[in-house]
């Protein structure tokens, strides 16, 4: 068993995801002797962002960090594809896939990945990390599983990863009931709570010294930011369940006198028909509310300095306020969007229509302004202390949960 004064080699497998600078908190922790990051090949840019952050802000601790390109998703998917072509008597079993991996891969797992104090795998149902967790267990490796995004649709590898883990890190206790209903599994005895989306304490302290003036200081209007990788304008679109359909809420905000800044990579008709043309409802709103609705480039928050762009805004919208089918809504009820932490990190007050983020409404009412309509939002703004909207937890706290619990479980 590990002791409280021990130092650890920590090995992480899974997507890096947004805000790679979170890992600065790992490097900065005295208990971490070495962080081995096994990243998937489609995350080379995110990995490079971590390297750049370390070189810029913690060059003296670079020796504590090492990265390895792990072609795991590609290898798994190609093996599955080849076996599917050959097999005609039913679906391909996971044991068949695993037995067809090259010996050099298993040697790498045994000689490299297995040589660690804490093997940490995660975080969601679509990045193939749950499959790797299942394989790790079959090879006799103990691991910690962190989990964030999921759906109310049973997925065999997710269930196996949960069952086989030594313990699981969940964002909050609402996931316990979620998985009871989804799989009839009780995780109470092996679950601890910390959110993988908590942002870096080191970065927050660095930004706290920045002198950034709010845009509202210049024009006296409340500026609302929307961060969304993509938005759609077809209200009948089914694949995203209304998640990316922001037209109604933007129009309501504009009519109430707010200035809205939409930062997005892609504006399309729908996920089913991903085309762009004008006019569309978003460009029509720009014409109707000239100077009050701006469509802008995405803010690359992988670069710490770009938080200063986000810090100019007063309010940050968490979701479109439009629900969808049950399997999506069930997760949204317990979800804490990663944008919530981005906004708090930048001194932006998170706002959300009522009824969507039900867990947050019951537990985060002091950190989010929930409103039934935009006129109520306007009234609520007169009652709050904007300076009180600050993050309560950081990735350093996530790491502490991971290491403290590892001392008891591993």
Where are these regions (language model features)?
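N-terminal subdomain of nucleotide-sugar transferases
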Residues: 1-84, 247-259
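Short N-terminal targeting/anchoring amphipathic segment
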Residues: 91-97, 108-128, 144
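Active-site proximal beta-strand in glycosyltransferases
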Residues: 118-125, 133-152, 167-170
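A short, active-site helix/loop in glycosyltransferases that binds the activated sugar's phosphate group
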Residues: 155-156, 164-190, 200-202, 359-360
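A charged, aromatic-enriched C-terminal amphipathic alpha-helix characteristic of glycosyltransferases
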Residues: 195, 201, 206-207, 372-375, ...
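Conserved catalytic-core segment of nucleotide-activated headgroup transferases in glycan assembly
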Residues: 199-306
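Nucleotide-sugar-dependent
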Residues: 235-238, 300-345, 352-362
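A short acidic/histidine/glycine-rich donor-binding loop in glycosyltransferase catalytic cores
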Residues: 364-371
